[in-house]
Amino acid sequence: MKFFVDTADVNEIRELSETGLLDGVTTNPSLIMKSGRPILEVTREICEIVDGPVSAEVTAVDFKEMMREADILSKIADNIAIKVPLTMDGLKACKALTSSGRMVNVTLCFSANQALLAAKAGATFISPFIGRIDDMGIDGMELIAEIRTIYDNYDFDTEILAASIRSVNHVKQAAIIGADVATVPPAVLKSLVKHPLTDKGLEAFLADWAKTGQKIG
């Protein structure tokens, strides 16, 4: 599974990138707003930190304007993935963009039918929103499983990018089902390494080592 971080905070991105575990970044208009910086400026800096795909979202809702904005975003860096909404105009833009060799992340997916259309449109990534589906009282992981089955049935190349992740359990379940990518808030990504028994075991090892009076090297 690939790990993307879902943020426009360059300090968080830089810290996580230094671990060698980060495969990409996703942003959206809300995250850009939280950064307090111009979209082109902050996205360019993110692309300089991360070698993998960096999703930058269009804000237009009609095909012509989506394509205009996509052209601007694409010029930021070669690793930009254009993020488009799962609408008919968004799918039309997806088809046009991927046909010209650009990466596209189709976002705001809430059904397997939508995911099927995105794959038909040649999407590089499909972003089903797990947490928001859970908020409706429906198990978001069922959607991931349905998409995985459909994509496997037809050998679609579109990667399932599990989004709206709220917990480490979301990450685990998405990995078990077979999502290709999990885009995770920084706090959740950092929490994946934590376990109380790991901390307890390390504490015991260090205490015993201190009793030996030894040093390595």
UniProtKB/Swiss-Prot annotation:
Its EC number is 2.2.1.2. One of its GO terms (cellular component) is cytoplasm. It catalyses: D-sedoheptulose 7-phosphate + D-glyceraldehyde 3-phosphate = D-erythrose 4-phosphate + beta-D-fructose 6-phosphate. Keywords: Cytoplasm, Pentose shunt, Schiff base, Transferase. It is found in: Cytoplasm. Its main location: cytoplasm. One of its GO terms (molecular function) is transaldolase activity. The keyword Transferase applies. Transaldolase is important for the balance of metabolites in the pentose-phosphate pathway. Belongs to the transaldolase family. Type 3B subfamily. This is Probable transaldolase. It comes from Chelativorans sp. (strain BNC1).
